[in-house]
Amino acid sequence: RCGLRTNSGNDIRSARRSLNLLFSEWGNRGVHLWKVQLNEQQLTAGVATYTVPTNVNDVLEAYISSTAQAADGPATNDIALTKIDRSAYSALPNKLATGQPSQYYVNRQIDPTISLYVAPDASTYTYLKFYSINRIEDAGSFTNTADVAYRFLPCMCSGLAFYLSQKRAPDRIQVLKQLYEDELIRALNED
């Protein structure tokens, strides 16, 4: 697509780096439904902050859950939590007060955490459940299958051609960028 021939191992390594940057850029653009995952974290009384897996880019929604024994078997009760930003979380008083959590804050660092307000007493609500959007895995070795849903494959090819054109075919940048953006819009609309 960008009018080049692969002549060296360096070209292939450059393409892999460009592909990894493309995947990172997709993560910055928004939610990709094939990377949404339900996570569970057992709550500990008085503990407000929990570490989440490092591949989590963000938490879309969260709730606390309890399971109680009912006459017809176990019954699950879920309470949705409200997501707040860092400023709102910082302004909250006494973050170690215990009770039924109603809000959560996601600290999106290299090792992300999720903080509940108030800290759970863990007598009734025993689990935190949350839907996370996970990072797209790097391209890895040259034989790996891309961590991409099939409807994003045309977009991936166009995006890679656009990224490579920035290095090797600057005269084709505008054409390839437009093709990439068109393919991306189609894929996102389908997602």
Describe each model-derived feature in a short phrase.
Residues 1-191:
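Glycine-enriched, solvent-exposed interface loops adjoining structured elements
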